[in-house]
Swiss-Prot record:
Belongs to the sideroflexin family. It is found in: Mitochondrion membrane. It is a multi-pass membrane protein. It catalyses: L-serine(in) = L-serine(out). This is Sideroflexin-2. GO terms for molecular function: L-serine transmembrane transporter activity; monoatomic ion transmembrane transporter activity; transmembrane transporter activity. Keywords: Amino-acid transport, Membrane, Mitochondrion, Transmembrane, Transmembrane helix, Transport. It comes from the Eukaryota. One of its GO terms (cellular component) is mitochondrial inner membrane. Mitochondrial amino-acid transporter that mediates transport of serine into mitochondria. It holds the Pfam family SFXNs.
């Protein structure tokens, strides 16, 4: 058993992350909602095992499946840049239970302005925690920047939600009014994520060569990574928030369903959860987490950084550099 366990490299992915299918398998494994209920002590125990294995100390011997489970706990709960235990609500493994409750509420209670304001406030508070938790941690963000990002995103979501609601209530069908929550979520993501990670855009994020050696700080890499995260987050929410209103529009016309109106909110919440179980790993897998950037683009848009690269590599600039884009 000991010989088997020594063959396990805890830093080597169990899936092929160069393909969408491999990334989907990895994120379905890593964002498993069941890991949310694992205690902090057990998570720290998993981290200790991973750190021992990295140092070459693979005792006591464990079965491969036990090692893999500890790797799963470690990857789901600890930040890839700092190794710190992530905020409970900010972990991607909490996206299904947290997202289903909040999205279900937004879809079920969209008819009045106070309800829209309440649920958008809750949603943006949750998003702020998720965005901060899954940032590139090598670019620190001040409390002031966090506050500005939170207030700006919440305001943009409310403006989009109330604006769409007031406009569509007069000119659109009841079906289109059901899409108000998605319009607000999409608008807020374009504001929340860049502002929450504005320090990365201002100062750049660490980029590495093929050997994992830091070769500079690139603002262009930050913009690319954050842009991909925005697309992923909107894609994560889109199916549930666009398909579910169509389903509910049909169901609410049925006499049988009208007699059990109390089931509306829990039913929508459950359906959103079903969508998210599939969409969380799908959205995370759209782009590689360890993103890359062609250095020829850096030469055009970041000439100073490219000159530094030439000096550090003695003219042998790598074709691509790599960085953690966050989730």
């Amino acid at each position: 058993m000991s010989q088997v366990s020594t063959l396990i490299d805890v830093d080597k992915p169990l899936f092929d992350l160069s393909t969408f299918a491999g990334r989907f398998q990895y994120f379905a494994w890593m964002t498993d909602p069941r890991t949310v209920v694992v205690s902090s002590d057990r998570l720290l125990e998993a981290k200790a095992m991973v750190e021992r294995y990295r140092k070459g100390d693979q005792s006591p011997p464990l079965k491969p499946e036990e090692v893999h489970y500890n790797m799963k706990l470690y990857n789901s709960a600890f930040h890839p840049d700092t190794g710190e235990l992530q905020n409970f609500c900010g972990r991607m493994s909490f996206q299904v239970p947290g997202g289903m409750l909040i999205t279900g509420g937004m879809l079920a209670f969209y008819r009045t302005v106070p309800a829209v304001v309440l649920w958008q406030f809750i949603n943006q508070s949750f998003n702020a925690v998720v965005n901060y938790t899954n940032r590139n941690a090598n670019s620190p963000t001040s409390v002031t920047q966090l506050g500005v990002a939170y207030v700006s995103a919440t305001t943009s979501a409310l403006v989009a939600a109330i604006g769409c609601k007031n406009y569509w209530s007069k000119k659109a069908t009841p079906l289109f009014q059901r899409f108000v929550p998605f319009a607000a979520v999409a608008a807020a993501n374009f504001v929340n994520i860049p502002l929450m990670r504005q320090n990365e855009i201002i100062n750049g994020i660490e980029v590495k060569n093929d050997d994992g050696v830091v070769v500079g700080q690139s603002r262009l890499a930050a913009i690319k990574g954050i842009g991909e995260v925005v697309v992923s987050r909107i894609a994560m929410a889109a199916p549930g928030m666009l398909v579910l209103p169509l389903i509910m529009e049909r169901l609410e016309k049925l006499p049988a369903y009208r007699r059990i109106k109390w089931i509306n909110a829990p039913f929508q919440t459950l359906l959103v959860g079903c969508f998210l179980c599939f969409m969380v790993p799908t959205a995370c897998a759209l782009f590689p987490q360890q993103c890359s950037l062609d250095t020829s683009i850096m030469r055009t848009f970041e000439p100073e950084l490219y000159e530094d690269l030439e000096k550090k590599t003695q003219g042998k600039v790598p074709k691509r550099v790599y960085f953690n884009k966050g989730l």
